[in-house]
Amino acid sequence: MKKYILLIIATIFTIGLFAQNKSTVTTIIEGDGYTYIKNIRKSRLVDLYNQENKYTNVPLVYKETGERPPFDLREKRVEDDNWTSRHSELIVNRAFTNEQKQIVRGHKLGVAIYIDSTTGKVVETEFTFPEMTPMAEIPLSVFRKIELDMKNEIYFTLTDVGKMYNYVFFYWMQEIE
């Protein structure tokens, strides 16, 4: 009987241990008139985004049917233009001070933008970076500046395919220069 009790206790302990390791740690960070969510995944990767985001963690679907599209990297959702990509990277780079650029040198920032599929305007941003890098020490105001500048300065010309979705999503990794 004693063995069975120990086995049950060990099983409960093991289940609890694994459940804790698989969960995401969520922190709410208050800025000056804005609030961000900081999720730290089990992999120690940080997801940072505005609490008001409505597309974060929402699947990409067709507007008319609500069904998920097949994954196709060749699918053209926006018209090609060199200006938008370059300007998006410029916005990220200019948000960092020279001192901050030195601190994060050699580390990359993941930048996601969510684009309104009717207007082509950036409506949301999300950032990813490893928790144990200098990127985690950058003030929230830097990410807020990137968000606001993206929303105010970046726009896309959508293709007919891009207009079919609830949003258009782009993601890139960028080393700050």
Predicted features by range, described:
Residues 1-27:
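Bacterial Sec-dependent N-terminal signal peptides
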Residues 20-177:
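Charge-biased low-complexity segments
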